[in-house]
Amino acid sequence: MAKYERTLNGDFNGLLRRIEDGILNGSFSASLEETSDFYENGARCSVRVFERYSYTGGNRLSMSVTLFQNGGPIHLSAVTSGGSQALFFKINTWGEETFLDCIKKIIEE
């Protein structure tokens, strides 16, 4: 598992679109598997689960992206999983780190 978290300022909807477009257009095998959105008392939470094939690992892996805002800055959490091939411990997590690099590039550009 790999994790990336940031606190950002800006437009929630614009950031969410940028993340979705950037991930889906940044990898030939990336797909948006599921979405969830909550609004309550001015707070907003959006969850996106992406999946892609890792050529280096020879397997599929997922990335869950959560955005949360309650009137102030936007909190971002991205977690990747599924890149290991071992049964009892994690080895070969390059695919997870590479997938996470996609969102880092989107956020830090």
Task: Cite the ranges covered by each PLM segment.
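N-terminal intrinsically disordered, cationic/polar leader segments
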Residues: 25, 38-39, 81, 107-108
